[in-house]
Amino acid sequence: MDAMISGKPMPIQSNRDATSSGWTKIAAGIFCWFFLISCSEQVDPLLQKANEEWVQGRNHSAIEIFNEVLKNHPSGTQAEEALFRLGEIHHFSLNNSTRALIYFQEVLQMNRMGPFSYPTQKYIAEIAEFGLKDYDQAIIEYQNLINHYKNENEGSDHQYRIASIYYKKQNYEQALVELNILLENYPDSSWAEESKFKIIEVLYTLSRCPEAREQYRHFTLEYSDSRFKEDMDFVVASCLEEEGHLQEAYNRFKSLEGRYIYPAILKMKLVGIEQRMKKNP
């Protein structure tokens, strides 16, 4: 859930780690790849050795062997894998995302539709957003994922990231557009509920409170037990406060006591409204 400062919500954040593949999944992926590739072509023993070295945490030894694989196989699937693993080592193990980006870009240059293309493009997008904080480039890279890889299960993830980035850039109107695109193109997405909640937040941020309240009304009918209920109640109360409906706003804020995740902010709201009502009884 997002905190709010001075009544305005903080930037949209995914509650899913953008680099959630994790070491266990990476290691599992390495050995699954061995199984698959062994059915179609002979695996260079050096490639297997390099992967084993990385799994064991011997990063520099793995790098040396992967580079030897590239000398022996300057093109083809094994070269693509060597470049891809070099990118992963530098990104995850050596915390050198700039160097990792070079390897990942080489993978795409070698074969944009190869077996490592999609995860490579995901890494590039994530590095642009979270590592380099180059938000304009990150939007381009996430859009590339949507345009070039028709993965319905993850397309909504990429669309959500685009909306989130526009919010980070404080381009709230475009964030609203992107959230609506998500709902239109991926109506059954696991992001649908959260996106509808974020739309309410964005409308409030844009001081479009009547629209925010209308969206809130539809939301509560559709998601009666939403995990965002307290956050939405806070937004609606904030709208009422901004519009001068102080008693109603106060009552809504008061009802959140013991339930809202940020009690200090809630207390600040209540005290502020109490002071306003004393000045203007």
Walk through the language-model features, giving the residues of each.
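Sec-dependent bacterial lipoprotein signal peptides
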Residues: 1-37
